[in-house]
């Protein structure tokens, strides 16, 4: 596309992202089961699952894009489970009314991450992306209300450097470790998001963070923290 893209990764490889721990699958309104599924039905299921607290426009857009995401993942080589006839398999997952979950056994997140990483590696090989591993973003360069670069630390040498940019995209994932109990990796914290917020980035609904049922104690001193 003509862009000079630099990717900065806190870990020693993008494959260390916590997405590798996801298991269940992805919901998409492809209606392979011919059971009346549609974008609107996926939208309504998602809204109900969120107790109607989610922003409707965003959820509807998510439902619209769901089928394309599956196609993209397949093109990246993600080995979704298939029926004997070769069609992608579906199962019911997460309280939905129809079978619309696409999955890779119990390792969907790992396979999606491998597919995305393979595409990234291809772009790196083509010279379209330059990868910087073991680099922690310390601050953002802001000029005239727009982000124009980053300040980062090389975690191997300890050297602090800066990089100018026309645009900065944060892809830090969740930050479930702001809660007392979490099954997420310790790197899933609010550090990068807080640094962007401190520099003026807009932030909304910080309470919408997934808490895995594994971390809900039956009783004890910390139960009130999860209500």
Where are these regions (language model features)?
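Short, charged low-complexity intrinsically disordered segments located at boundaries
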Residues: 58, 71-77, 99-104, 146-149, ...
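Terminal amphipathic helices with adjacent charged low-complexity linkers/tails
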Residues: 81-113
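Rossmann-like flavin
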Residues: 46-93
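Short secondary-structure transition/capping motifs
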Residues: 15, 51, 55-62, 101, ...
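Residues forming the flavin
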Residues: 1-42, 82, 105-227
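Residue-level detector of functional hotspots within protein domains
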Residues: 11-12, 64, 74, 87, ...
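Gly-rich Lys/Arg/Thr-decorated short loops/hinges at beta-loop-alpha junctions or inter-strand turns
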Residues: 23-24, 50-53, 92-101, 172-174
């Amino acid at each position: 596309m003509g862009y000079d893209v630099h990717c900065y990764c806190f870990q020693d490889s993008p494959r260390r992202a916590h997405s590798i721990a996801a298991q269940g699958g992805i919901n998409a309104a492809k209606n392979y089961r011919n059971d009346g599924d549609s974008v609107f039905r996926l939208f309504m299921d998602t809204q109900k699952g969120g107790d109607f607290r989610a922003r409707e426009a965003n959820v509807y857009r998510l439902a619209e894009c769901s089928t394309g995401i599956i196609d993209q993942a397949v093109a990246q080589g993600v080995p979704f489970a298939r029926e004997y006839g070769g069609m992608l398999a579906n199962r019911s997952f997460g309280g939905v009314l129809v079978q619309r979950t696409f999955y890779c056994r119990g390792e969907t997140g790992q396979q999606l991450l491998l597919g995305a990483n393979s595409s990234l590696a291809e772009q790196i090989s083509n010279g379209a992306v330059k990868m910087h591993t073991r680099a922690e973003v310390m601050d953002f360069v802001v000029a005239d209300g727009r982000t124009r670069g980053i300040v980062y630390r090389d975690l191997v040498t300890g050297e602090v450097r800066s990089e100018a940019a026309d645009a900065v995209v944060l892809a830090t994932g969740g930050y479930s470790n702001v809660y007392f109990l979490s099954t997420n990796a310790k790197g899933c914290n609010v550090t990068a998001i807080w640094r962007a917020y401190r520099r003026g980035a807009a932030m909304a609904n910080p309470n919408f963070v997934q808490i895995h049922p594994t971390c809900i104690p039956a009783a004890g001193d910390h139960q009130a923290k999860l209500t």
